[in-house]
Amino acid sequence: MPPLLGDMAGLGKASGANENNPNEHWVGTWSNALHQPDLGVPGLANPGFNNQTLRQIVHISVGGRRVRVRLSTFGASGLVIGAAHIALHATGAAILTGSDRTLTFGGTPSITIPPGALVVSDPVELNVPELSDLAVSIFVPGNTGPAAWHFEGRQTSFISPSGRFYSKRRDAG
């Protein structure tokens, strides 16, 4: 089975400011359910992505001072994430100036997610109001193969032309 693009399985807030604080508590505030790349319905197959940036707008419920993102893959081979960013959403594909944050995974800005696994980003400082929208941008430097997707998504996602557009304030595609 070819690799499938992972999903943003959750964002959260921390009640404590110290990463080593045993009282720190993360709360999931957004997630989605994915479908197979091809449901057998003409026109609904997703061939995947190749050297592109994906920007997904997520409407969160709980706000906070710090956020982190979980990414997963359902594929039989690893999924390479070349870079990932999170920012406050402006309009369309635009992000609010000054809100862009680089996501890292164990201190590294890129990661290969093993088949069937999920990864959690390191926390980043970002003051997020409750009931706001965030833009999560993921650059995939190679061909992902068929990508999982959500059949009844209620937010517009953006796909760039070839290249790294993850921190652009303007439209990502």
Predicted regions and their residues:
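N-terminal secretory targeting modules
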Residues: 1-173
